[in-house]
Design a protein with these regions (language model features):
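Structural motif corresponding to the early beta-alpha repeats
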Residues: 1-15, 36
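Cysteine-centered iron-sulfur cluster-binding motifs in ferredoxin-type domains/subunits
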Residues: 208-246, 255-279, 294
Length: 294
């Protein structure tokens, strides 16, 4: 489970939340417990409320087996946290072949930082919110030419799972077909070859140039929007039009406008950008969406 650091108000929240989680899960301890979504700002919150001290104490009392944190920031901030808190057993990172060379996500640099500190790695977003399933047609063709017996998603998850020091690869599955697909290639896992790894990184660089707005649809931005703008949905429509996956999304855009705030309603308060794990320039991107569809 995880301690929602960004939403803590007082130091006492940690103990209250933790014991509620134990009760709801019906367990006496957690195998893995992490501080949720640390970045340079949330790290200060964790320090302010003694979150590191608390989870270390819970580990000492046998209520947690391994402690760590999920992370969304640059490698230098990760290095700072791991240097100041060597007691951490693992770190959860966003790693996929699309973000491997990304200047904002810094998958490669963050992974190398965790390895330097000798930490186990838990990987989130291996298919980047579905972006590495719904790839451009030319990329899909290249993957099928490489091995037509494997799904598009399998390449992304195998890329993550092939890295050393990786303990777990988290995969969000929405149906049994996806579950069975994951089992098919992970049951007797075959790591990528060096050639395959290099090929996927090159594909990632290619895909990154084709994605207009690299949103993962995590929805962190939407709950606090004062204008009820469904930001990820608008970005998805914009990307599909730009990638020519569908040339006309006007009807869907109109439906969204009727049920939610529209991009032009944005008052530029910036709350969405403060919580975005991808560090997207959401305000300016909403203007792009409006220009495209209005």
């Amino acid at each position: 489970d995880k301690l929602p650091v960004p939403f803590m108000k007082v130091k006492e929240d940690a103990q209250k939340i933790f014991y509620e989680q134990l009760e709801k899960c019906g367990v006496e301890y957690f195998d893995y417990y992490l501080l949720h979504s640390l970045n340079r700002n949330h790290y200060q919150t964790a320090l302010k409320f003694d979150c590191f001290v608390f989870i270390k104490k819970m580990k000492e009392e046998g209520k947690i087996k391994e402690i760590g944190f999920s992370f969304h920031d640059t490698a230098d901030i990760l290095d700072q946290i791991l240097t100041e808190h060597p007691e951490m057993d693992f770190v959860q990172l966003q790693i996929n072949y699309l973000d491997w060379n990304s200047d904002s996500v810094q998958s490669k640099l963050c992974y190398e930082t965790a390895v330097k500190h000798g930490k186990k790695v838990v990987i989130m977003e291996p298919v980047k919110g579905g972006s590495l399933v719904h790839v451009p047609e030319d990329v899909k063709t290249k993957l099928f030419n490489l091995d037509n017996s494997l799904s598009v998603a399998s390449w992304a998850i195998r890329f993550a799972a092939s890295l050393k020091n990786v303990r777990v690869v988290l995969s969000g599955m929405s149906n049994l077909e996806q579950l069975y697909d994951n089992i098919s290639y992970m049951k007797e896992f075959k790591p990528l070859t060096q050639e395959e790894n290099k090929f996927l990184i090159q594909l990632g660089d290619q895909i990154r140039t084709s994605i207009a707005i690299p949103c993962t649809a995590c929805n962190y931005c939407t709950p606090g929007c004062p204008k009820n703008i469904c930001i990820p949905e608008y970005f998805s429509l914009y990307n599909k039009r730009k990638q020519t996956l569908s040339k006309d999304k006007s009807d869907e855009y109109d439906n969204l406008k009727n049920e939610h705030g529209k991009p032009l309603d944005c008052i530029e308060c910036g709350q969405c950008e403060r919580v975005c794990p991808q560090k997207l320039l959401i305000i300016s991107n909403l203007k792009k969406v409006a220009e495209e569809f209005e």
